[in-house]
Amino acid sequence: MRDFFFDTANIEFIESTMEKYGSDIKPNWVRGVTTNPNAFSKIDKFHLDEWINHAHKMGHLISQIRGDNNGEIHIQAPFSKLDPEVILEYAKIISDVTHGLCKVGMKIPPYQNVLEYVDEFNKHVLTNVTGLADSSTALKCCTYDLNYISIIPGRMEEVGIDAESAIAFVNQCNFGKTEIITGSQRTTEQIIYSFYLDTVPTIGEKCWNDIFQGDNFKRILDIEYGYEPVGPFSPLITQDNIDLSLAFFKQMDGLGDTARKDLEARLA
């Protein structure tokens, strides 16, 4: 089994999951926690100070689970169209509050003006371009010095997009340092093929019990990482891919609006 991220901001859930399944999960398999405004909304946290305080708690928890300070918490910018300099200040705030506990991954949108700021972000945090729903945009992002890109197969498959082929194509074309995170997983099968495709999957609350049903966990442990080449041409990119990414950021921007206002007031 390779590394994974907990896809939740619910500390109590992470603690109970490790208590229940910790004997089967090696501590260093837990890469960390990934969150976004939707994850914070599910635990009724909408204000910036709540996000900052919770980031510290998550960093402390991941440090305890792993027994080191090499774990990661990934926090999304509260609004996708923030000026890159504002996102950088936000990244510094989160990095300061988690100093000595863990690394911080800043989840940023795939917009050109933000991508051009990646070198500045990298001086302070790990960089993770999120909300990707097509192979072309994903590969464009990989030309920048990013630590991660996050593809959203669960959401892609809900609208009939072949996420597995898209991820395999990106992996076979990406020769840089950028790792692929597979997020928004809906089923254990998606998690299994995400491991098979040599990505770092995120595992949300709904999937954990199912992972330990039947032979699912054994299948994950026995996976030989790799995949068959999918050919020299990118999977077809349609309006569905574009609409899905736009809908993702529209949802996150709405849920992060309170934190955005708090951040802008704090930096004014």
Residue map of PLM features:
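Catalytic cores of alpha/beta
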Residues: 12-25, 89-90, 116-117, 134-144, ...
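C-terminal alpha-helical cap/extension of soluble enzyme domains
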Residues: 177-268
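Structural recognition of alpha->loop->beta junctions
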Residues: 22-29, 94-104, 123-124, 143-148, ...
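Glycine-rich phosphate-binding active-site loops on the catalytic face of alpha/beta enzymes
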Residues: 32-33, 37-41, 131, 147-159, ...
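Active-site beta->alpha loop and helix N-cap motifs at the rims of alpha/beta catalytic domains
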Residues: 2-21, 27-119, 123, 153
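Conserved anion-binding
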Residues: 98, 109-118, 122-179, 185-190
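Alpha-helix N-cap and loop-to-helix initiation/capping positions
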Residues: 46-54, 82-86, 133, 158-166, ...
